[in-house]
Amino acid sequence: MNKARRIVNLADVPLKDNGDGKSFKAQVGRVGPMLGLTGLGCTLTVVPAGKRAYPFHRHHVFSELFYILSGSGEVRLDDRTLPVRAGDLIASPAGAEAHQIVNTGKDELRYLAISDMATVDVIDYPDSKKMGVAAGVKNGDLSTATYKAFGRVTPADYFDGEEPVQQPAAKLGTGSR
């Protein structure tokens, strides 16, 4: 039987530094595993003033829901920028608008990121023209992926470079079969 707690106070969630320390800076705490959740992710995200936790991106496999706990900022949704504040819910369905939450306020911005827990995802980053693919992800933590690749894609036809490989002829043995 799973002995995970069923109630967690957000003040008790351990936080880890995340980001590049420049434009992207946050502390994140994985709440879902603390609660024993496997099909639903929940992460506490704390973003200092003037920063953002993640690049502008779109998930093609899983949906996210953000709940602003405290502070204020803006959310980019494709070509729109909208103000957000404590109490707001932001929906990001799989394959919908690219999104990014930015702390434009004076105080830290705290929010919960809730998602369905796909073990595979395809992510695109419109600002940098990158794509990402991840597989074998555990508890929504990309660092656990058994395969991940991030880069820029050069368009190619599906069959481009896929010439049949000649297999060497089988050698006949002298033993019994």
Please state what every model-predicted region is.
Residues 25-30, 43-59, 94:
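Conserved short histidine dyad/triad with adjacent acidic residue
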Residues 1-39, 124-177:
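A short, N-terminal "cap"/entry segment at the start of jelly-roll beta-barrel domains
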